[in-house]
Regions:
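Interdomain hinge/linker segments and adjacent boundary elements that couple functional modules
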Residues: 2-16, 20, 24, 29-34, ...
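Positions in alpha-helical segments
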Residues: 16, 41-44, 257
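Short glycine/serine/threonine/alanine-rich loop segments
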Residues: 27, 38, 203
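Key DNA-contact positions within bacterial/archaeal DNA-binding proteins
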Residues: 30, 40-41
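N-terminal membrane-targeting segments
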Residues: 36, 44-45
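C-terminal regulatory/effector modules of DNA-binding transcriptional regulators
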Residues: 164, 171, 183-283
């Protein structure tokens, strides 16, 4: 077992899942450590992501905890063996860790679903739009800090442009479409970009019009990241102080249902493009 000062988001998730397995098996850390032939301190360090864990140890722990879901177990194994130093590591000294965790989880996701009520999806923002958003972050960032955030956001978008892009589905409230971030020129360019991206086969954009009134999750910005198996999905919520990550199965099920409802309420992709085009022409 090895240590590192800043565990990756995926290593943290593996640690969380191993703790969940132990708790479901009804074992204390003392009993589990004894059966594994290790100390309680070492097991606690594994479950808190301070120590890494080998594939063989993951399989042994899963077997000891009577976990028969081999797809899930092997997904955990792959999470420990995949390349851990992604492009986001270059930002570790200049951006909050939560933004790096989001980039890492997105990079390894199989699909992404999002819903936004007051701003454009980060994965579909233009550089000028993102720059204007980050200029209004509190506490006020310096110009270099703004550019670091813009660069990081644009690099996240490689998910959509790479050779094997993810499936991306987003619902954006009409309010976010109409807000003229950066003025008419920047806002119009953002809408044209949104239209262009919506034409891609693997990208679905839907607008939730003002006319729907109240809807589930209003006021929330939600990123739902699909993992290799449903148990390893992640729901991420935007908060003023930074991103919040959720992995409890009951919450994952709730946010999947919420997104289902919002998507079924929103305009079709075709009607969405018509509305975005009309709003763009009025700017």
């Amino acid at each position: 077992m090895t240590t590192r000062p800043a565990p990756s988001a995926r290593r943290t998730r593996v640690a969380t899942e191993l703790r969940k397995l132990r708790e479901r098996a009804g074992m204390t850390t003392t009993e589990a450590a004894r059966r594994l032939g290790t100390s309680t301190g070492q097991l606690s360090n594994v479950e808190s992501a301070r120590f890494g864990v080998s594939p063989d140890r993951i399989r042994a722990m899963a077997s000891m905890y009577c976990c028969a879901d081999q797809d899930y177990v092997e997904a955990l194994v792959r999470m420990t063996t995949a390349r851990s130093h992604g492009w986001w590591e270059a930002y570790r000294e200049v951006l909050p860790s939560g933004l790096l965790d989001l980039a890492e989880l997105e990079y390894h996701s199989t699909a992404v679903r999002t819903a936004y009520t007051t701003h454009m999806p980060g994965l579909l923002q233009t550089p000028d739009h993102a720059r204007e958003i980050f200029r209004h972050v509190l506490p006020a960032p310096t110009p270099p800090e703004v550019e670091h955030r813009v660069s990081h956001r644009i690099q996240r978008q490689d998910l959509i442009y790479r050779a094997q892009p993810i499936t991306y589905r987003t619902v954006v409230h009409e309010a976010a479409v109409r807000i003229q971030v950066g003025g008419p020129r920047v806002a119009r360019a953002q809408l044209q970009h949104l239209l262009a991206m919506s034409e891609r086969d693997h990208v679905t954009v839907q607008v939730l019009p003002f006319g729907v009134g109240a809807f589930p999750g209003s006021g929330q910005s939600i990123n739902y990241l699909h993992g290799p198996v449903p148990q390893l999905d992640t729901a991420q919520l935007d908060q003023f102080h930074g991103p919040v990550f959720l992995d409890a199965e009951a919450l994952l099920e709730m946010y999947r249902h919420l997104l289902d409802v919002v998507e079924s309420t929103a305009l079709s992709p075709e009607k969405t493009r018509d509305l975005i085009h009309a709003i763009s022409q009025d700017m």
